[in-house]
């Protein structure tokens, strides 16, 4: 099977019979890189609340507190994955060679880029180094993953799913802070990569969804990733141009339509059991929330302000539920299981 790497709390818990040290080692070996998508979700929530402070007058302490949580979460998860890489390098190599898992490896570089935006005003120097490290790492990962797509021997159309957008989205995130730290041409370079290949991959993914079997339940939450490229693209474009023009509106309303399409299938998503892949709900929803708040700032007296408030409330609820369900899964030892 191609979708087995997301653990679920709906599965029965296997009694632990191994020695404690051996059990801990096994869990570390199977620590999923996809768990770093939770950092993207919390960072996105942070940015939404920080923007809400500027646009809606929301308490700044909420955004600042979430920024600390996102930073600590990234450090903790990166530590665990680093230990996994040192102790079980073959397990990491298997993830990199996996046709689906490999798309979650860039969550590391994307987390750095998002944290850079989180610290953009509070600690510009720290934000610069986070952005630089994230941009360089993500560009390298983009070349590696795109190269594997071209010179592959193990990909099939069934492997195509919205998670393939993750490497693309990172390139669109680079200009959000990059326009402050480097030449505008560099920001346009990354933006162009992300936007063009988003359209290419969107065609492939839609073909797979329409003409082949539906996504398995464990990958169904990744459909929300469809929201991310146009939402982040809108934010990056407005940051680079300083205006909401016709093209910016095309990006935003594309994201809004996709959100309405997903909302019309809300019952299906609510009926799904919890998987780690459910964190795919968080960052795309955060990106749409942030984009809506940006629209509210540029188009005053419109419905974007109440829409942004509603999306912020929904996003906060979604992240809180995901965090609670993840902690329950950790308590029950349902995470980090063998495939």
What is the predicted function of each stretch?
Residues 50-63, 118-128, 176-188, 237-247, ...:
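Helix-coil boundary and interhelical linker segments in multi-pass alpha-helical membrane proteins
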Residues 65-76, 126-139, 187-198, 247-257, ...:
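Structural signature of hydrophobic alpha-helical transmembrane segments
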Residues 74-87, 137-145, 198-205:
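Membrane-water interface of transmembrane alpha-helices
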Residues 113-150:
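A generic, well-ordered mixed alpha/beta core segment in the N-terminal half of proteins
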Residues 144-145, 176-177, 200-209, 232-239, ...:
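Alpha-helical transmembrane segments in multipass membrane proteins, preferentially the mid-helix core
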Residues 193-252:
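Aromatic-anchored, glycine/proline-accented short structural segments
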């Amino acid at each position: 099977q191609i979708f087995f790497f997301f653990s679920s709390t709906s599965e029965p818990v296997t009694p632990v019979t191994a020695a404690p040290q051996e059990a801990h080692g096994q869990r570390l070996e199977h620590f999923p890189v996809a768990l770093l998508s939770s950092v993207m979700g919390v960072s996105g929530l942070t940015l939404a609340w920080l923007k809400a402070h500027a646009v809606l007058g929301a308490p700044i302490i909420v955004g600042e507190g979430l920024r600390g949580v996102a930073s600590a979460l990234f450090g903790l998860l990166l530590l665990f994955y680093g230990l996994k890489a040192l102790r079980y390098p073959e397990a990491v190599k298997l993830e990199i060679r996996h046709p689906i898992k490999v798309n979650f490896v860039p969550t590391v570089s994307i987390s750095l880029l998002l944290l850079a935006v989180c610290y953009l005003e509070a600690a510009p120097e720290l934000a610069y180094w986070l952005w630089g490290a994230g941009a360089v790492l993500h560009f390298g990962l983009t070349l590696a993953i795109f190269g594997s797509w071209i010179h592959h021997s193990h990909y099939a159309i069934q492997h195509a799913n919205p998670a393939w957008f993750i490497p693309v989205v990172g390139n669109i995130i680079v200009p959000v802070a990059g326009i402050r730290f480097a030449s505008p041409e560099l920001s346009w370079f990354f933006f162009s990569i992300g936007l063009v290949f988003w359209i290419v991959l969107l065609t492939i993914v839609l073909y797979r969804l329409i003409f082949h079997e539906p996504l398995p339940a464990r990958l169904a939450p990744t459909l929300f990733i469809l929201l991310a490229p146009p939402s982040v693209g809108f934010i990056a474009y407005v940051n680079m141009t300083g205006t909401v023009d016709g093209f910016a509106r095309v990006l935003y309303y594309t994201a809004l339509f996709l959100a309405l399409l997903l909302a019309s299938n809300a019952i299906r998503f609510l009926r799904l059991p919890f998987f780690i892949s459910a964190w795919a709900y968080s960052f795309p929803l955060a990106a749409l929330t942030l984009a809506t708040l940006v629209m509210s700032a540029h188009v005053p007296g419109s419905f974007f302000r109440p829409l942004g408030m509603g999306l912020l409330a929904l996003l906060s609820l979604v992240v809180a539920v995901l965090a609670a369900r993840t902690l329950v899964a950790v308590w029950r030892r349902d995470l980090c299981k063998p495939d």
